[in-house]
């Protein structure tokens, strides 16, 4: 009797399951990386907007108010809500300036927030 060489149907099916699971793992990793890339792009843009607002406020050379001020603008095809306020410090001639960037005014947490310190003009 001759011995037949080759793979049985069960062996082929097990190999297909292994390759299918590996393919699913690769697809899931790629999807997660794509989502993270979008979030990173969003945070980078929000950080730039916060930095631009800080620079604009510094160039105005005004003492920051202790209440929130706000504006809405369009950047990269998206509407952004930016707000800022002065915060008292232990030194009367120094004030903290906080800037927060959100997608909407009603968002609970900002996408980006920055703080700098300004001296009395």
From Swiss-Prot:
Matching PANTHER family: TYPE II SECRETION SYSTEM PROTEIN I-RELATED (PTHR38779:SF2)
Main localization (coarse): membrane
Membrane topology per record: Single-pass membrane protein
Classification via InterPro entries: N_methyl_site, Pilin-like, T2SS_GspI_C, T2SS_protein-GspI
Task of the protein: Component of the type II secretion system required for the energy-dependent secretion of extracellular factors such as proteases and toxins from the periplasm. Part of the pseudopilus tip complex that is critical for the recognition and binding of secretion substrates.
Residue positions where N-methylmethionine is found in the record: 7
NCBIfam families reported for this sequence: gspI (TIGR01707), IV_pilin_GFxxxE (TIGR02532)
Keywords: Cell inner membrane, Cell membrane, Membrane, Methylation, Protein transport, Transmembrane, Transmembrane helix, Transport
UniProt name for this protein: Type II secretion system protein I
Originating species: Klebsiella pneumoniae
Organism lineage: Bacteria, Pseudomonadati, Pseudomonadota, Gammaproteobacteria, Enterobacterales
């Amino acid at each position: 009797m001759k011995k037949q060489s080759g793979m049985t149907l069960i062996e082929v099916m097990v190999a297909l399951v292994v390759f299918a699971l590996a393919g699913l793992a690769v697809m899931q990793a790629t999807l997660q990386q794509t989502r993270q890339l979008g979030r990173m792009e969003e945070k980078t843009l929000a950080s730039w907007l916060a930095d631009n607002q800080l620079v604009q406020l510094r160039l105005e050379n005004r003492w920051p108010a202790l209440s929130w001020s706000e504006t809405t603008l369009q950047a990269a095809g998206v509407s952004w809500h930016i707000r800022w306020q002065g915060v008292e410090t232990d030194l009367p001639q120094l004030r903290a300036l906080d800037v927060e960037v959100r997608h909407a005014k009603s968002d609970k947490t900002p996408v980006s927030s920055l703080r700098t310190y300004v001296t009395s003009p």
